[in-house]
Amino acid sequence: MMPRKIVYGENAAKEFEYPEKSLIITTTTPDIYEKWLSYMGIKNYEIYDKVTPDPAIETIEEIKKKYDGKEISTYIGLGGGSSMDVSKYLSKLTGIPKILIPTTFGTGAEMTTYAVVSFSHKKKLLQDEAFLADVAIVDPYFLPGTPFNIMRNSACDAMAQASEGYDSKLGNPFTRFFCKEAFDILEDAIINDKPELLPYGAMLSGIGFGNSSTTLGHALSYVFSNEGVPHGYALSSCTTVAHQFNKSPYYERFKKVCQKLKFEPLKLKLALDEAADVIMPDKGHLDNNPIEIKKQDVIYCLDKIVNANPLS
């Protein structure tokens, strides 16, 4: 599955004709989004700019309540995965269509039927066909000026998605084609310092894993994200260890990219046994892993992540 309409390329966000009375949902500050909106030429809109990373269900309910009774034609998720995930969930609740526009190029959220929402301070991966964008717009305009930490976390996320998606039990020739293309492009972007390739690679990654799944690396990462570690940062070690465990063809290549991006080792406050108990119910990731995963395997992987510096 893919969005009903995909608009890609230089000036894509500038040339698109946006409906009036849209609600723009973003995580960024006025000094940044006002520049974006001027470029995009959007008129007669509302804006909600208080979305935080790993958005809570309470935030979504607050937005819905705030704009109940107002005439909203479209949700525009403008930013990283969190802004787009909030727009997806709101669209499912209200039936209002959504336009998704990434500015960080990592999650591939604009291409998928997935959304990550926090319930009781714990991230949960949700899937629903209603989360698919009505329009996805990918424009490299938003790339310049992206802080290094955001860029590297986003790139790692996209590469983890592509490589885990390639290995997934749900994969097929169609999804593996997109996952392979995405990884090759993203690897070239990082290793050979070609950041202009990141938007295209992330978009292809979203198509690939969005029609298969991510696997063990993502399942391991959420206990770190629950302790405040950015998602892409958590994946640097988690997906490296998962690829090694799975004997993935992407193990060495993924590790090399993470070394180039200079990710630091991860720490975990939660005891490994308790962390494994949190991870094991994540059947959406673990059941699609190429190798069957048991609790002792999760503990083994977590131990390597926090005690063996897998990126050294």
Residue ranges and their predicted role:
Residues 1-74, 265:
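ATP/NTP phosphate-donor binding region
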Residues 57-141:
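Glycine/threonine-rich beta-strand-loop-alpha-helix active-site module
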Residues 70, 114-212:
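Carboxylate- and glycine-rich phosphate/diphosphate-binding segment that chelates Mg2+/Mn2+
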Residues 88-97, 209-212, 226-228, 244:
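Alpha-helix C-terminal capping segments
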Residues 159-163, 198-206, 220, 239, ...:
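Short alpha-helical scaffolding segments that buttress acidic/His motifs in well-ordered protein cores
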Residues 215, 219-273:
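Active-site pocket-lining segment
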Residues 252-312:
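C-terminal charged capping/lid subdomain of soluble metabolic enzymes
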